[in-house]
Design a protein with these regions (language model features):
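Generic C-terminus detector
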Residues: 252, 543, 556-558, 564, ...
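Conserved short alpha-helical segments that host acidic/polar catalytic motifs at enzyme active sites
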Residues: 1-250, 261-294, 333, 428, ...
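Hydrophobic alpha-helical scaffolding
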Residues: 7-10, 99, 119, 135-138, ...
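Active-site phosphate/pyrophosphate-binding segments
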Residues: 259-263, 267-297, 377, 387-516, ...
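Glycine-rich phosphate-binding loops that contact phosphosugars or nucleotide phosphates
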Residues: 291-440, 520-561, 584, 592
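Glycine-rich oxoanion-binding loops at beta->alpha junctions
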Residues: 70-83, 274-287, 311-347, 494-510
């Protein structure tokens, strides 16, 4: 959740640090700070609030030097304040630390240090690490860091500076992402790729239990005992311009409009040239591989969880394999029936979602095979899973996921077709029909974009409301859940989703005159029942917006407003029908004056439990 940057070289460190932190704003934060070494001392500037507050502090009191670290903080221990912001130092200012994660035994360590006479300024767990460095310093910076790490329990990405050895920065990680960027006469540290993408594409992806000693001309990597580790250079293939707004007002809007390309890139390498079959070269499964699967367990969080709910329909209907879908943070606590015949599919945009990573490790511990669906090559989840199928969405910067979600659905639908053909449960004709419609998706997205004025026109009916309800049946129910999440996370309007058939089991008591209801009715087999549900809420004077396929003639008779999406196969239409809901959420949030890319209290990548 927090953002970390580090620099050592010949340029002014503060310039890089501020630029890198700006590129990590999407991760979510409530305070920010930098520390720069110069002339025998470490100068620290930190401020609560947005990065502009830190920029003003640095402008008022410049920091000069070519070695430094920076941080955007998301409060876990201690509220947002200047004093709780990172970097943290020991009392003498000999060490400076930035940290992402949670030190679980910090109270135990703090009590030990208090007894020795150390004084603490902040409420954070991180300050303990700075004092521990001072307490354990043995005249050798690297040796001290190793000893400090041996005392810590929990999850962390940690970056250390020491004024006694300003020619190096040291970093290490456990269960939180960290990369080292390799430059010419300068090197970089970051928690995520966008921070360094305009400076270098060559990186070391740090693994748990590794320590990197980063100097301006060299990077040495060892294990916790000091044994050298040979690291392979990972070259980032992202387009640097893809991590910029490119003329759009917000990253979210840009990423909505990037979906045609993202969808095309994700499926083009997995559909045969004749367009009739699916093949995952990276999996290369055999019929025996698929037939040995007793059940599939999908685990994910947030938007990725909603993709998993739709995947349950895809897989069970097309491949006839039973599927369970778990919220990752709950999976470990229900003693799941997982064994060697279970395929665990984990879905995560960032590949760093801590709860999903923990669920993956637990499933593997119980003997399950594992497959990751993620957007980030080299991420923790991609390295932990047995196999990986990447969504080629490119960088997604906005907190509210859009193109990552649609490419997850595309990947999961293709995977369902792949398994169904291999185990003999899917006919050639059915596969060809779905693929024919799927390959039309990039062009059909334009049909949704053409309705943007209609979607904008609906904002007045929503922007001042306290509640919005989304209803749907079958695959539309999973879609309703994602639509409600999009609206609530960026507009701050309370939004809930319900299966259409559940209205009469309690939800109807909340429907009254003028309450907006978005009724998803794209699934042909349940349309009649959805119309009955729409009539139920209309009878209570709700304001109903229907979402239907083009050519539908029935739903429009019962709703107040209609959004039409190009007609497609029932398995494909959910991928298309989410786009108007993304646009609606976006324009409602904009009309309310909200910071769409960085909604309050939320982070892009949730890396603490």
């Amino acid at each position: 959740m927090c953002g970390i940057v580090g620099y050592i070289g010949d340029r002014e460190a503060a310039d890089f640090l501020m630029d890198g932190l700006a590129k990590l704003e999407y991760r979510g934060y409530d305070s920010a700070g930098i520390a720069v070494y110069h002339d025998g001392a470490i100068a620290v500037r930190k401020k609560a609030g947005r990065l502009v507050n830190l920029a003003e502090a640095v402008k008022a009191h410049p920091v000069v030097g070519t070695v430094g670290i920076g941080h955007t903080r998301w409060a876990t221990h201690g509220g947002p304040s200047d004093v709780n912001a990172h970097p943290h130092t020991d009392e003498k200012g000999d060490f400076a630390i930035v940290h992402n994660g949670i030190i679980e035994n910090y109270m135990e360590l703090k009590e030990e240090l208090l007894k020795k006479g150390y004084h603490f300024k902040s409420e954070t767990d991180t300050e303990v690490v700075a004092h521990l460095c001072a307490d354990m310093y043995d005249g050798d910076f690297t040796s001290t860091v190793r000893k400090v790490l041996s005392r810590l329990r929990g999850s962390y990405s940690l970056v250390f500076m020491c004024k006694f050895e300003p020619d190096k920065i040291i970093c290490s990680k456990k269960d939180n992402p960290l990369i080292v960027g390799l430059g010419q006469g300068e090197n970089y540290i970051a928690s995520d790729i966008p921070a360094i993408l305009s400076y270098t594409r060559k990186t070391y992806i740090m693994n748990d239990g590794e320590i990197a000693i980063v100097m301006k001309d060299n990077v040495w990597v060892t294990d916790l005992e000091g044994k050298p580790i040979s690291k392979k250079v990972f070259e980032v293939n992202w387009d640097a311009e893809a991590a910029e707004k490119g003329g759009f007002e917000h990253f979210m809007l840009k990423e909505i409009y990037e979906q045609p390309k993202a969808i095309k890139d994700t499926m083009s390498c997995r559909i045969t040239k004749d367009g009739k079959h699916v093949h995952f070269e990276e999996l290369n499964w055999t019929p025996e591989d698929v037939n040995s699967i007793g059940k599939i367990m999908i685990t994910a969080c947030g938007t990725a969880y909603h993709a998993g709910l739709l995947a349950k329909y895809f897989i069970e209907k097309l491949a006839r394999i039973p599927v369970e879908v778990d919220i990752a943070s709950e999976y470990r606590y229900r003693d799941p029936l997982t064994d060697s015949k279970t395929l665990c599919i984990v879905v995560s945009q960032s590949g760093e979602t801590i709860d999903t990573l923990a669920a993956l490790k637990e499933a593997k511990r119980r003997g399950a095979r594992s497959l990751a669906i993620t957007n980030v090559v080299g991420s923790s989840i991609s390295r932990e899973a047995d196999q990986v199928a990447y969504t080629w969405a490119g960088p997604e910067i906005a907190v509210a996921s859009t193109k990552a979600y649609t490419t997850q659905l595309v990947t999961l639908l293709l995977l369902s077709l792949y398994m169904g053909r291999l185990n003999g449960n899917l006919s050639v004709e059915r596969e060809e029909k779905i693929l024919a419609d799927l390959t039309k998706l990039p062009d059909q997205c334009q049909g949704v974009f053409d309705q943007v004025d209609t979607i904008k026109g609906l904002c007045d009916a929503f922007k001042n409301k306290e509640d919005v309800f989304f209803i749907g049946r079958s695959m539309d129910y999973g879609l309703a859940m994602e639509g409600a999440l999009k609206l609530k996370e960026i507009s701050y309007i309370h939004a809930e989703s319900y299966a259409g058939g559940e209205l009469k089991h309690g939800t109807l008591s909340l429907i009254e005159a003028g309450v907006p209801v978005i009724a998803l009715a794209t699934q042909v087999e349940v349309e009649e029942k959805m119309i009955s549900n729409i009539k139920e809420v209309k009878a209570r004077d709700a304001y109903v917006v229907g979402v239907v396929q083009e050519g539908d003639t029935e739903v429009g008779k019962t709703v107040d407003a209609l959004i039409k999406v190009p007609a497609s196969d029932d398995f494909v239409i959910p991928i298309l029908a989410i786009i108007p809901l993304q646009l609606l959420a976006y324009y409602i949030a904009v009309s309310r004056g909200n910071d769409v890319d960085k909604p309050r209290n939320l982070a892009k990548s949730v890396t603490v439990e």
